């Protein structure tokens, strides 16, 4: 079997404090570079397990990313809330003509651009750092059209108190 030298623990979500649990983050066992290279569905990614959003890469979305490949060949694709570009890059692998990935996080967009370069997709995929809620009406006014629009927003609520605002946010997009 595989011998594990070290693990990077990310038990640092704010919800742990709400549940009365300690927030922890760091190495268990041997230390290693926290920026790791992974491959999924024919796409390579750099994932920063220490500084990335949550765990840095959402493994539970593997089959959704694969499903996107079936929809995008030859099309123009808009990937909203792109994070590190995983849906956008899967669209490009599938043969999308042009892909625009949008995220409000400068760090996420920087990582997405790095992942596009890693896969030789800099020409097909463009990533911009903008607020999706401001960009969508602007694209509509400019007459931009897309064959596929990917909406994978972050959670708009983490508690009952903000459900009303969350529903408003989901309706808006």
Regions found by a protein language model. Give the residues of each.
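Conserved SAM-binding motif I beta-strand of class I
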Residues: 98-103
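Conserved alpha-helix/loop element of class I SAM-dependent methyltransferases that forms part
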Residues: 59-75
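Conserved class I S-adenosyl-L-methionine
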Residues: 74-83
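Conserved SAM-binding loop of SAM-dependent methyltransferases across substrates and taxa
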Residues: 84-97
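Mobile active-site "lid"/loop adjacent to the S-adenosyl-L-methionine
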Residues: 147-173
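Local beta-strand N-terminus motif with an aromatic residue
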Residues: 4, 74, 145-146
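S-adenosyl-L-methionine
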Residues: 107-150
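Non-catalytic substrate-recognition/targeting regions of SAM-dependent transferases
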Residues: 1-57
């Amino acid at each position: 079997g595989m011998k594990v030298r070290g693990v990077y623990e990310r038990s640092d979500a704010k919800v742990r404090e709400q549940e009365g649990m300690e927030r922890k983050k760091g190495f268990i066992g041997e230390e290693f570079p926290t920026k790791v290279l992974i491959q999924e569905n024919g796409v390579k990614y750099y994932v920063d397990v220490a500084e990335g959003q949550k765990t840095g890469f959402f493994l539970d979305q593997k089959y959704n990313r694969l499903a996107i490949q079936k929809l995008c060949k030859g099309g123009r694709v808009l990937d909203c809330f792109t994070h590190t570009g995983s849906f956008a890059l899967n669209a490009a692998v599938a043969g999308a003509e042009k892909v625009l990935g949008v995220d409000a996080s400068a760090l996420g967009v920087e990582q997405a651009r790095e992942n596009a370069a890693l896969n030789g997709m800099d020409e097909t995929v463009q990533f911009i750092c903008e607020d999706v809620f401001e960009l969508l009406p602007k694209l509509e006014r400019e007459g931009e059209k897309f064959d596929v629009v990917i909406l994978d927003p972050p959670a708009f609520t983490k508690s009952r108190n903000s459900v009303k605002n969350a529903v408003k946010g989901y309706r808006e997009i």
